[in-house]
Regions:
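N-terminal Rossmann-like NAD(P)+-binding subdomain of aldehyde/semialdehyde dehydrogenases
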Residues: 1-113
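Rossmann-like NAD(P) dinucleotide-binding subdomain of oxidoreductase/dehydrogenase enzymes
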Residues: 105-201
Length: 201
């Protein structure tokens, strides 16, 4: 169950519906479709959107922090610090995208020719987030992977659906391709079945 519960009183403030199996399948399909659109953008274009995401965290810091206070009882000063740190994380990866993604020559042990390490998109990635840092954990996972070109399926902690909703809104607002970042309010059982179905693929 995804719900905002006052950690001091135990009062349930708002409940969020879990997705169905069909909705989960559709989200996964959208993520695979988004891979093509995401990798069609240049690294600089992807980085520009992630840079803007960091700016949105700073512009909305008070609202985002207040959500964390409500959901998990984090002191406001700490919540603001977490949101600000996310702005730094997104900016860090965006500003260094070209450097991080450039081919890295490696020395051949034998023979002739050249060899490089090339970092390229693998496909959709699933992030299962804990409750204690609802913004930071997403930033460090999603930011760099989206710059590479990997779409993100993000399962938030059951205690943090409102912060997940606010994060989704920011990702939508920066104009990433549809399906590139999706919040999925899935059950543990749904995720376990999906992960098991992908074993060895």
């Amino acid at each position: 169950m995804y719900a905002v519960v006052n950690p001091a009183t135990g009062e349930k403030l708002e409940e969020y519906p879990e997705i169905s199996d069909d909705e989960l399948d559709a989200a996964i399909a959208r993520a695979w479709e988004a891979r093509e659109a995401l990798t069609a953008l240049s690294a600089a274009e992807r980085a520009e959107k992630i840079k803007r995401l960091g700016e949105l965290h700073l512009e909305r810091r008070e609202t985002l922090a207040a959500i964390a206070v409500k959901e998990m009882g984090k002191p406001m000063e700490q919540a603001l610090g977490e949101v600000d740190f996310c702005g730094d994380i997104y900016s860090y990866y965006a500003d260094r995208a070209e450097e991080f993604l450039k081919d890295e020559p490696i020395e051949l042990l034998a023979g002739e020719g050249t060899a490089v390490i090339r970092r390229s998109a693998m496909g959709p990635l699933l992030g299962i987030m804990p409750w204690n840092f609802p913004y930071y954990q997403v930033a460090r996972f999603a930011g760099p992977n989206l710059i590479v070109g990997n779409p993100i399926l993000l399962k938030p902690a059951p205690q943090c659906p409102e912060s997940a909703e606010a994060i989704q809104k920011m990702y939508d607002d920066v104009g990433l391709p549809e399906g590139a970042y999706q919040t999925i309010l899935a059950t543990h059982e749904q995720i376990a079945r999906y992960v098991k179905s992908q074993a060895g693929s």
